Amino acid sequence: MTKDAYIEFCKNLVGADTDQPFNEDFESTVARHFDTKKWFALVMEYQGKTVVNLKCDPMESDFLRSVFKGVIPAYHMNKVHWNTVFLESDVPDKEIERMTLTSFELTDKKKRMPKKSSKKSPKNPL
């Protein structure tokens, strides 16, 4: 998948937007949720190749890294929850799209479970 095709795929997701937030860096593109501005993909150059960082379930991350040479622990992000995917590699376009949709869902604030309150409730409030 080419960089332009990938960015177009991200732009076409309902509720997604893309931008280039880094000063003087016009090569990197962030795909984010329109309402929360939370990232779900970071497209950039790494080792002379175009890559995308995507959020992933930790168990699936390990599996994908073992199956595809083009999937490695994320560059410059949490390596447990994020993978770096080489766009023009052994990873099929449909798999890159699936991983992107997963990242989109995992970073969607509306889908996340509420955090447990750290405050203790009284045993007998009455």
Where are each of the predicted segments found?
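Charge-dense, helix-prone N-terminal extensions
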Residues: 1-126
